[in-house]
Amino acid sequence: MADTCCSRTCVVAASTLSVCSSDLSCGNQVSSPSACIGSSWQVDDCQETCCEPTCCAPSCCAPAPRLTLICAPVNCESSPCCQPACSSSSPCQQACCVPVCCRPVCCTPVCCRPVCCRPVCCTPVCCRPVCCRPVCCRPVCCRPVCCTPVCCRPMCCEASPCSAPSSCCRPSSSVSLLCRPVCRPTCCVPTFFCQPSCCHPASSVSLLCQPSCSSSAC
């Protein structure tokens, strides 16, 4: 069953293959139930290898007698979701770059996960900085070891004439499981067209960074 040319894996359906309980190694030959006289039968969940060229067509993995092979998906190489999730020029961390070719789940980057930012828009562009108003990323930094968003700035900066994106709010160090940004007193100068506060108070929600501002801070 094994083939040296194989680079991918086919999984044998658990309900279609059994081996004698006295010999459960993956490399042994599987025979019919009549050959296992006096032995009970158990499910063999060992992975079997097969030769799958780039087409990934079902014909590349022809089922053997009494076996059903699950090779998938068909034409996976032609799908944009089957390309490696990261490249050498990607801002993502290379240590977590895992190719997603031939996997049924698509459009879910597996490498674009910096320390405090979790992408939810199915594209690696989430790892790019988004000023003040995150679109694809949502800071999830309210954890003891995770209080500095990497790809998205905290949600405390509101775009307004009296706020400066670079100096409005900065996240404080994490306390327990809550992380709250603090406002610097000099971040907002009241004007005729502006509200006197650059940071709008918001309640802190678990696992989310929310601004926590007092009226005297700005």
Swiss-Prot record:
Residue windows of the Sequence repeats: 50-54, 55-59, 60-64, 86-90, 96-100, 101-105, 111-115, 121-125, 131-135, 136-140, 141-145, 151-155, 161-167, 168-172, 187-191, 198-202
Pfam families recorded: Keratin_B2_2
Region called 16 X 5 AA repeats of C-C-X(3), residue ranges: 26-202
UniProt key word Transmembrane: no
Coiled-coil features, chain-numbered ranges: none
InterPro entries: KAP
Keywords: Keratin, Repeat
Repeat found in the keyword field: yes
Gene Ontology cellular-component annotations: cytosol; keratin filament
Family: Belongs to the KRTAP type 10 family.
Record's subunit section: Interacts with hair keratins.
PANTHER family the UniProt entry points to: KERATIN ASSOCIATED PROTEIN (PTHR23262), KERATIN-ASSOCIATED PROTEIN 10-1 (PTHR23262:SF50)
Role of this protein: In the hair cortex, hair keratin intermediate filaments are embedded in an interfilamentous matrix, consisting of hair keratin-associated proteins (KRTAP), which are essential for the formation of a rigid and resistant hair shaft through their extensive disulfide bond cross-linking with abundant cysteine residues of hair keratins. The matrix proteins include the high-sulfur and high-glycine-tyrosine keratins.
Name the UniProt record assigns to this protein: Keratin-associated protein 10-8
Record gene name: KRTAP10-8
